[in-house]
């Protein structure tokens, strides 16, 4: 697919405005990408602000540039990369300040390099119906999500499905963007948190002064864990007949106290 730097179709361009009787120039995402690339390389942040303000005034408000209803047109400006998490949403606006743009461009260096190589892939590959690299990223993400879902639903007696790589996945791996690895880690984290065991809590009693010196304790008895009494036993001895070995006809007579169990003479 080769990119046309000229006019885009009206239905794909959100800036069909008229100023002074003339149509505002209609931009393609690739044409804007090449301009944004020059601004990044030359670090012309003030010129970039002037360019956005002059050409897209309807998206500028209070030194803020909004991306509402712009489609893929400005994805290369902030190098939008879809996230595996549903909590991370697409950026809706940026501040038109030189310090902010310098920080934004510095934080998205690798993402913009990824966009550059994906644009080159789209341009040299026939049959790729995409106008923005984020469409390829979404395709790779969707393919990986389907693979992980099929992996979760597989039966034990059926071979697991094979992961089918996209032709451009190697470009993603080059910039450490591996949706398969990220989604599998997310799956493992989800299963491990769902099967967590409850930790057993041992309640230990510490022998402190409050336990030892009980005011209401019985003075005639020791502490509970000994199980003995201070009073002497009033023995009540009994004699029983017991066979000491199995199959032995000899029986022994044992004399013991039935109260404390002490053997008698």
Swiss-Prot record:
A GO biological-process term: regulation of DNA-templated transcription
CC annotations in GO: host cell nucleus
Pfam name, any one: Baculo_LEF5_C
Disulfide bonds: none
UniProt keyword terms in alphabetical order: Host nucleus, Transcription, Transcription regulation
Domain of life, source organism: Viruses
Subcellular localization: Host nucleus
Entry-linked InterPro entries: Baculo_LEF5_C, Baculo_LEF5_N
Main location per the UniProt record: host cell
Protein's job: Plays a role in the transcription of late viral genes. May function as an transcriptional initiation factor.
Subunit structure: Interacts (via N-terminus) with itself.
Family indicated by similarity: Belongs to the baculoviridae LEF-5 family.
Protein name: Late expression factor 5
Source species of the chain: Autographa californica nuclear polyhedrosis virus (AcMNPV)
Chain's gene name: LEF-5
